[in-house]
Curated annotation (Swiss-Prot):
UniProt-listed Enzyme Commission number(s): 6.1.1.7
Disulfide cross-links: none
Pfam family, one: tRNA_SAD
Signal peptide: none
Main location: cytoplasm
Protein's recorded name: Alanine--tRNA ligase
Length: 865
């Protein structure tokens, strides 16, 4: 019976829902509450605290289709991806879980029913394994389910290994929950090489594990003894790719519908015809992990999860390059992936444009260095080959140079080397890497962090949410990392109290400042930091003395605290506004909240435009004007997520969390100090925006009076610039006039050749273009001086307007008056004018009539001279 991957997923979830299981959404690929994990790599990750008894949920049965990534860290399948039938960087794990509810009998019965009745797999193609001493599981399979004994294989401990070190015994660590497993295998047939589990040929591809059921039955003690758990649990996992291959009648995972669609799409965008090429498999796998990592907030970078993403992208691009890809191609597969993932691709569809953009930019950036790096790598490999030595090995220094200088991940270099049958000097590479780390450590060693050096057992109770004053006693004091019994004036120290209203730096909010007072002295608190479960007050003994055990009054600088709280609340509004405007890919990557402003780092690929920044300000200030009451509620983490609260990636949260809400605009998990209402913020103003790393932008902003100061400073700058511009304009006008005067003088000289004689009098009649009336007057005066005695008429056309200037030397005004002359011409061109007998001007609008009007001047003068 053929089933698509999407149909398999839905059938699994519906089956277990019918068995009383709660369908739980796939958790993020970035584990929120487990700092030990780079990526979510198993279905049980999100339920870890449930299995440990640290968290209780509203259900005791759950089922999921969990997205997983294995690339980087302990679980790294990257170098095998594309070269085997079942290795992937991204996969989906179908799972059903029991938290102290049902156990082995039901788990085994559920698995068998789903496989043989829902999926209708032939029972004779299935065989199972149990832990060697797990007679209970063996009997359930044999006597209750009916699997023949010869198809149930007992698997013991590995030879030479520790007790319980077996493929069929699961353990979280050296101590803690553990228990036996039972695995279900599918027989792909005699035509495929491979032996049954437990035989020397078990690594063949004939018998493939499809479902693992882990029975958390014991709690292993430090001495190795196994104590039965009061409430045993079940954790199961079935890879959707493997079971889909069976349901679609194929052997390799890369032959199922999801991968075939991606392989065909990749071949099409690259222009490559051989669909069996392994590079197409690599690309098809990598687009899945890259796309969903970006959906879950990971951005390409040079560290941590971002660097793993960058490595996967670059590996895919390099394989596309091998196949002859021209230009960016990888991002073009996102739409195909979103469609073929069916119901599991809805979030990818919503963020498709963002994912495509991230991949395209990263691919284009890498494309500029790929060619150069490949040239260096191939040259190095060619040099080694030419030496003809046995055992071709690429030295670690070259691998490091490619990584450090050209951004070539070591595994990409390893891929290329392996294709050319070279080995990598991994030891030499690690040595070069360690030398670089040491240089970085030495460069960053600026002083002693006494806070990190101090160990203290005290647990400080924080009482600062409701006030800025309190009383307590001194639990411990430290000077330069050493515990002391007393302090004197001038001592720089760290004080730990039993209870304090001082907020310790956390979540980007800086620590409080203020005073710790006694009758005998004052300690000025300059900063407050966390110290394990204690709160450390850093500062100086301003006056008097202080001793361990003294009763003290604690006084936070309330004005400073208030300013910090306003900026912290504004940070939440800024985060929400950025996500609303730029997209849900925007996630907080860091922040700093101080009394005089805030700094917010977030994931985004491009500079935020001036128009976008203006809109962000508008959105934030609109929420400030609405004066939302800032509500704080304490609830369990699951309830917080259902409420839509944003959690910060990498942050570890307690079972109970503080949820901060500002109307329906912003809901976040936050333990910081905030304003009472958004209106208290007053005003929000962005002062700068810029990039701090690949894909990470930074906004700095101020609020309240600081925002007013920033606006006034900006206005003052504008006024200053306007004054400067006005002054420059005046200077330019003067320069322009000087140039015009020079041009007029030059023009006067040029037109002197047009002077004619009428009845013994020198006459100049000329039409010009582009001059202004002031220049014409200057020209007339210059010409009068040059001719000594004469009559001048100059006409000028400028912007479809006519300017006329007439000049007559004083010895001729008894015969010809300038006003009469200019009036006569003006009347012919639709204008009028007049002036003194020796100088007159007029205007007109009929440009077409000007040539004919000019022709009438000479006859008119001949009659009068």
């Amino acid at each position: 019976m053929y089933m698509s991957t999407d149909e398999v997923r839905n059938a699994f979830l519906k089956f277990f829902e019918s068995k009383g299981h709660q369908i739980v959404e796939s958790s993020s690929l970035v584990p929120h509450n487990d700092p030990t994990l780079l990526f979510t790599n198993a279905g049980m990750n999100q339920f870890k605290d449930c299995f440990l008894g640290l968290e209780k949920r509203a259900y005791t049965r759950a089922t999921t289709a969990q997205r997983c990534v294995r690339a980087g860290g302990k679980h790294n399948d990257l170098e095998n991806v594309g070269f085997t039938a079942r290795h992937h960087t991204f996969f989906e794990m179908l799972g059903n879980f029991s938290f102290g509810d049902y156990f082995k009998e039901d788990a085994i019965a559920f698995a068998w029913e789903f496989l043989t009745e829902t999926l209708k797999l032939p029972a004779d193609r299935l065989l199972v394994t149990v832990y060697e001493t797990d007679d209970e599981a063996f009997d359930i399979w044999n006597k209750k389910v009916g699997v023949p004994a010869d198809r149930i294989i007992r698997i013991g401990d590995k030879k030479g290994g520790k007790p319980f070190e077996s493929d069929n015994f699961w353990q979280m660590g050296d101590t803690g929950p553990c228990g036996p497993c039972t695995e279900i295998f599918y027989d792909h047939g005699e035509h495929i090489w491979g032996g049954r589990p437990g035989t020397p040929e078990e690594d063949g591809d004939r018998f493939i594990e499809i479902w693992n059921n882990v029975f958390m039955q014991f709690n292993r003690q430090a001495d190795g003894t196994m104590e039965p758990l009061p409430k045993p649990s079940v954790d199961t996992g079935m890879g959707i790719e493997r079971i889909s291959a069976i349901m679609q009648g194929v052997h390799s995972n890369y032959e199922i519908d999801v991968f075939q669609a991606l392989i065909k799409a990749a071949a099409e965008v690259i222009g490559y015809e051989d669909l069996s090429n392994q590079s197409l498999r690599v690309i098809a796998d990598h687009i899945r992990s890259c796309s969903f990592l970006i959906v879950d907030g990971v951005m390409p970078s040079n560290e941590g999860r971002g660097y793993v993403l960058r490595r996967i992208i670059r590996r895919a691009v390099r394989h596309g390059n091998k196949l002859g890809a021209q230009g960016a191609f990888f991002h073009k597969l996102v739409g195909v992936l979103a469609e073929i993932m069916g119901t599991a691709g809805e979030e990818l569809k919503r963020q498709q444009a963002v994912v495509e953009k991230v991949l395209r930019i990263e691919e284009e950036n890498f494309g500029r260095t790929l060619e150069r790096g490949m040239a260096i790598l191939n040259e190095a490999l060619d040099n080694i080959s030419s030496q003809g030595t046995d055992g071709k090995v690429l030295d670690g220094e070259t691998v490091f140079k490619l990584y450090d200088t050209y951004g070539f991940p070591a595994d990409l270099t390893n891929d290329v080397a392996r294709e050319r049958e070279f080995a990598i000097d991994e030891e030499g590479f690690e040595k070069a890497m360690e030398e670089q780390r040491q240089r970085a450590r030495e460069a960053g060693n600026f002083g002693t962090d006494y806070n990190a050096a101090i160990k203290v057992d005290t647990q400080t109770e924080f009482c600062g949410y409701t006030g800025t004053k309190g009383s307590s006693s001194v639990a411990a004091m430290f000077v330069e990392g050493n515990e002391v019994e007393s302090l004197s004036a001038g001592d720089k120290a760290i004080i730990v109290l039993g209870e304090t209203p001082f907020y310790a730096e956390s979540g980007g909010q800086c620590g409080d400042a203020g005073e710790i007072r006694t009758e005998s002295g004052v300690f000025r608190v300059e900063d407050t930091q966390k110290l394990g479960n204690a709160i450390a007050h850093h500062g100086v003994m301003a006056e008097g003395v202080l001793a361990k055990g003294d009763e003290v009054a604690t006084i936070v600088d309330a004005e400073r605290r208030a300013a910090i709280s306003l900026n912290h609340s504004a940070t939440h509004l800024l985060h929400a506004a950025l996500r609303q405007l730029l997209g849900e890919h925007v996630t907080q990557k860091g922040s700093l909240v101080k009394a005089d402003g805030l700094r917010f780092d977030f994931s985004h690929l491009e500079a935020v435009t001036a128009a976008e920044l203006k809109e962000v300000e508008r959105l934030v200030n609109a929420q400030i004007r609405r004066n939302h009451v800032i509500e704080t509620n304490v609830m369990d983490i699951e309830s917080a997520k259902k409420k839509g609260a944003m959690a910060l990636f990498g942050e570890k949260y307690d079972d109970e969390v503080r949820v901060l809400s500002m109307g329906d605009f912003s809901t976040e998990l936050c333990g910081g100090i905030h304003a009472s209402s958004t209106g208290d913020i007053g005003l929000f103003k962005i002062t700068s925006e810029g990039g701090i790393a690949a894909g990470i932008r930074r906004i700095e902003a101020v609020t309240g009076e600081g925002a007013l100061d920033a606006i006034e400073a900006q206005a003052a700058k504008y006024e200053e610039k306007l004054a400067e511009s006005a002054q420059k304009a005046k200077s330019l006008e003067k320069e322009i006039q000087k140039l015009k005067d020079k041009m007029a003088a030059a023009e006067s000289a040029n037109i002197m050749g047009k002077v004619q004689d009428i009845n013994g009098t020198k006459v100049l009649i000329a039409a010009l273009e582009g001059a202004d009336n002031k220049n014409l007057r200057t020209m007339v005066d210059d010409i009068k001086n040059q001719v000594g005695s004469g009559v001048i008429l100059l006409a000028n056309v400028n912007d479809d307007k006519i300017g006329l200037i007439a000049g007559v030397t004083k010895d001729l005004i008894g015969k010809v008056k300038a006003g009469d002359l200019v009036k006569m011409v003006a009347e012919q061109v639709g204008g009028k004018g007049g002036g003194r007998p020796d100088m007159a001007q007029a205007g007109g609008t009929d440009v077409a009539a000007l040539p004919a009007a000019i022709q009438t001047v000479q006859p008119w003068l001949e009659e009068r001279l």
